[in-house]
A protein has these predicted regions:
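Enriched for short, Lys/Arg-rich terminal
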Residues: 1-5, 12, 53, 57-62, ...
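Arg/Lys-rich, positively charged N-terminal/basic patches that mediate binding to nucleic acids
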Residues: 1-30
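Alpha-helix capping and helix-coil boundary motifs
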Residues: 16, 37-38, 79
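A short, surface-exposed loop/turn module that caps and links secondary-structure elements
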Residues: 29-56
C-alpha cells in the first residue's frame, strides 16, 4: 500500500492556484498506478532524479514528488518553468 504526504508548500500552491479538484483526481491516479508502467502512461510520470518524479495534472501543470519506501511525498506544483526553478534550487 502506498501512502501520500503533502507538504505545506504543496497544499498552499494548489489552493492558491484553485486546482484542488484537478490535483485530487491526479493524486488518486498516481496512487493507483505508481510502479506499474502501463497504468501510469496517461499521467506522464517521469523520473527527474534519484527518487524524484513529476506527473502532469493537465497540459500545463505538474506535480513533483519523492518516492521512498512506499511513501510518495508531494512537495511542489507548478508549470514547466516553475518546476525547473524549483529543481535548480534543490541541487
Amino acid at each position: 500500500m502506498i501512502s501520500v504526504k503533502l507538504s505545506k508548500r504543496f497544499k498552499k500552491t494548489v489552493r492558491s492556484a484553485g486546482r484542488e479538484q484537478e490535483v485530487s483526481e491526479t493524486l488518486k491516479l498516481v496512487i493507483e498506478g505508481f510502479g506499474n508502467s502501463h497504468a501510469h502512461t496517461g499521467l506522464s510520470i517521469r523520473k527527474l532524479g534519484r527518487h524524484v518524479y513529476e506527473c502532469r495534472t493537465g497540459l500545463a501543470w505538474r506535480l513533483v514528488f519523492v518516492a521512498d519506501k512506499g511513501v510518495l511525498s508531494f512537495d511542489f506544483a507548478g508549470d514547466h518553468d516553475e518546476i525547473q526553478n524549483y529543481l535548480r534550487g534543490k541541487r
